[in-house]
Amino acid sequence: MSASKQTILSVEHLKKYFQTASGQLHAVDDINFTLAKGETLGVVGESGCGKSTLGRTILRLHEPTDGKVIFDGKDVTACSKQEMKKLREDMQIIFQDPFASINPRMTVSQTIAEPLLIQGKYKPSDKEALNRHVRQVMDRVGLAQRLVNAYPHELDGGRRQRIGIGRALALEPKFIVCDEPVSALDVSIQAQILNLMQDIQEEMGLTYLFITHDLSVVKHLSNQIMVMYLGQCIEKAESSELFKNPKHPYTQALLDAIPVADLDSRHTER
């Protein structure tokens, strides 16, 4: 990492173990990395490799078993409950399934407004200012103003995920864990959401931890990519370098799994 880049996140020997009927599950096992402000670290691996648990442990949605998370100079792992509430203004998450992570009884405006009310940014009586803020967020994530009173079941997957992104952006955070935010969407919608997230990152100077099982998703989005397998980091490199020269056989297997349109071959077969 260049000396001119400011480190916003440092993860040191982070571990998260779960006790199961068959013994101890090492979901996250001694993970180390640093992330510069405004950059994206892609975390890639198959289902069950520990990548989502890593993201949630960094945010202390899971309590770490051991290790440290330093965010913007603060030791997240040592913060009190009250300190964590304040810190959550700067550390947010976008979940994989917008239908499961959004309250079906809340409208678009209520969902985006909820974190603002919880953090005391507005009082319920400040309706005009709160509504103005919500509408600004809706504009930022590409949600039409006519949807302000719509419910999740009335919207398609792409719009529901825009609500989830809007909710994460409402408090204007510095860092967002993006937990497979496009895996539940159609390919055409995936591209729209990825472009939106890139635009928002540039506009707001955001830092992303982007979790996915698909290397092709993070190829152009990430500055660095970390490959996880069975809770461990088996390879980490600059994005371009990892695609050109993978060091680990598992990384090569993930690259081989990316579909390639071989038009010449198809024409030859005809």
Please describe what each predicted stretch is.
Residues 59:
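Helix-to-loop junction immediately C-terminal to a conserved catalytic motif
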Residues 75, 117, 128-146, 255-256:
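Conserved ABC ATPase "signature" region
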Residues 67-75, 87:
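Conserved ABC transporter NBD signature motif
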Residues 2-7, 21-24, 238-270:
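Short catalytic/signature loops enriched in Gly
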Residues 170-174:
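A short, proline-enriched helix->beta-strand linker immediately N-terminal to the Walker B motif
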Residues 151-155, 159:
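Conserved ABC ATPase signature
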